[in-house]
Regions:
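Phosphate-group recognition and catalysis centered on beta-loop-alpha active-site segments
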Residues: 20-253
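Bacterial Sec-dependent N-terminal signal peptides
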Residues: 1-24
Length: 253
C-alpha cells in the first residue's frame, strides 16, 4: 500500500511538473485564421480564448489626440496611426466588419476571457510618445483590474525600459528586437527575450542560458510544424503563432 502511495505521489508530481514545463501557445494578433475573425479584432481575442490559448497577442498605437487604439500596421486604409485621431481610426472597418477597436474597448472585452493579454506597444516616432503611451496603458490596465493578466512586449528599447519602470513589479516585460543577450536582458530587468525564430536558430544556446538565469523565452512567428517541434524540444516557454490549433496539437504530442 505504501509503495502504491509513493508511486501515485511521484506520478502526480511528474504530471504537475510536465504541465508547468509545457510550451504555452500564444495566438499572434489573436486567433484570426477562422470564420468571422480578423487580425487584432475583438473576435480574434474571444476566439483565442475559446480554444484555450495561454495568451492572445495584440498591437497598440498612440493616436494624434493621445488615445490608444489596437492595430498592427503604422498605416491602415491610408490612415496613419500616429497622425490620425482616434475618431478617424475607429471609423475604419476591419476585414470581419468590426470597427477598429480602441484599447479600452479591447480590454473591456478581455475581462470576459481568461487568456493572458500580450500587449505589444509599437515603436513610435519619438521616445516621449512611447513614454506617454506606456503611462496611459499602465493606468488603464490598473483601472480595469487586469494587471495580473498583462504581459508587455515591444521592439523599442526605450519602451521596454519604460514598461519595466512603470508597470507593477513582477509584470512580465519582453524585448522583441533580438539584439540583446540573455545576460543583458536579465540586467535590464526583462522577463526574457521574445525573439524571431531565426534568432534562436542562430543562438540555440540562448534558450538554456535564459532558463539558467531564471528568464522565460518566447519565439515568433512560428507557423511550420518542423519549427514548432524544434522549439518544443528545446523546452521553450512560449511560442507565438498564426496557427494556434496546429501548435496545440504539436504541444500535446
Amino acid at each position: 500500500m505504501k509503495i502504491k502511495k509513493i508511486l501515485l505521489t511521484s506520478a502526480l508530481i511528474l504530471s504537475t511538473y510536465s504541465a508547468i514545463a509545457q510550451t504555452q501557445v500564444i495566438a499572434h494578433r489573436g486567433y484570426w485564421k477562422t470564420d468571422g475573425s480578423a487580425q487584432n479584432s475583438i473576435a480574434a481575442l474571444l476566439k483565442a480564448d475559446s480554444i484555450g490559448c495561454y495568451g492572445s497577442e495584440f498591437d497598440v498605437w498612440l493616436t494624434a489626440d493621445d488615445k490608444l487604439v489596437v492595430n498592427h500596421d503604422p498605416i491602415f486604409k491610408l490612415k496613419s496611426m500616429e497622425r490620425s485621431t482616434a475618431a478617424t481610426l475607429t471609423s475604419l472597418k476591419l476585414d470581419n466588419g468590426e470597427q477598429l477597436p480602441t484599447l479600452e474597448q479591447y480590454l473591456k472585452a478581455a475581462k470576459k476571457t481568461k487568456t493572458q493579454l500580450i500587449l505589444e506597444l509599437k515603436a513610435h516616432s519619438r521616445p516621449e510618445r512611447e513614454t506617454l503611451a506606456v503611462e496611459k496603458i499602465v493606468n488603464m490596465v490598473k483601472k480595469l483590474g487586469l494587471e495580473k493578466r498583462m504581459e508587455y512586449i515591444t521592439f523599442s528599447l526605450h519602451a521596454t525600459k519604460e514598461f519595466i519602470r512603470l508597470a507593477p513589479a513582477g509584470t512580465p516585460v519582453f524585448y522583441l528586437d533580438g539584439k540583446l543577450t540573455p545576460k543583458e536582458l536579465k540586467e535590464m530587468g526583462c522577463a526574457g527575450p521574445d525573439y524571431h525564430l531565426s534568432v534562436f536558430q542562430r543562438h540555440p544556446e540562448w534558450i538554456k542560458e535564459c532558463h539558467d538565469l531564471g528568464l522565460k523565452v518566447n519565439a515568433w512567428t512560428v507557423n511550420k510544424p518542423k519549427d514548432m517541434k524544434w522549439l518544443i524540444e528545446k523546452n521553450i516557454d512560449f511560442i507565438t503563432t498564426n496557427e494556434p490549433i496546429l501548435l496545440q496539437e504539436k504541444v500535446r504530442n
